[in-house]
Amino acid sequence: HADEVVTSWGRETIHVYSEEQVGEILKSLENEEEYGDILRAKGMVKGEDGTWIYFDMVPGEYEVRTGAPEYTGRICVIGAKINEEKLEKLFGL
C-alpha cells in the first residue's frame, strides 16, 4: 500500500452511542470496498448512560472502553481511499 495516499477524516459530534454501536461501527470499518482502506480509527463519544466511550481500532482488532468525560465527542479515521460520505452515514452524522 506504499503508493496509496493516506488521509484522515475527523468530526466532532454530540451524537450519543452505546458501546455495542461503537463495536459494530468498528467491525464495519474492516469492509474495504465500502469505507476504504482504514488503517486506524480512534476517538471518544458520549455514551447512552452518560459515560464516555473511548475507542481505538487498527485492522483486525479494536478496543472499546469508558473514560474521562469530554466537552464534545471526537472521531478520527485514517486510511487510503476513505469514503467520507459512507463514514458519515456509518457514524450517524
Question: Model-predicted segments: where are they?
Answer:
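Flexible loop/N-cap segments at domain edges
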Residues: 77
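Conserved nucleotide- and phosphate/pyrophosphate-binding catalytic cores
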Residues: 73
